[in-house]
Amino acid sequence: MNDFKERNVEFQRAVPDVYGDAHPKGLLKSIQEDGEHLKQLSSQHIISSDQFGRDVLLQLFRLAAKFEANPQRFRTPLQGKILISAFYEPSTRTRLSFESAWHRLGGDIMSITDRSTTGIAKGESLSDVGEMFNNYGDCVVLRDTNESSVKDMMRSLRIPIINAGN
């Protein structure tokens, strides 16, 4: 007989209070909804949080709280959308946070974690790779050691790119 069954061992995850005073429903009440601020984000490249003003950031936090407060309602806004996750620098937490969020919102992911498996290894420029990404995905998240990588790729992208760090 299985040793665990003999001892009646049950494994349960404790549910920690990760919110403290910042529970999503409290956040929803404290920030007035103003969707006008989010309209400017449609199909926009995200290079740095510095590019957003306070009002846009507050509306993003409010939207995130809406998703978290009612995850069943927001299960598929990215259905049919493909994220190209190009992490040319090791970063497990950052990569998985982007991929998990995209997946939880109903999207699909194409993940590249090794520069040597791309055309870059054969001498293609990031601009060339960006042109290829236009044909396969709806959004790119890029992390690279080179600070100019995002701007190099932006030259040829017709889809949004998110800078995941460099």
Model-derived features with residue positions:
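Positively charged, low-complexity intrinsically disordered leader regions
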Residues: 4-96
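Phosphate/diphosphate ligand-binding glycine-rich loop within oxidoreductases
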Residues: 76-166
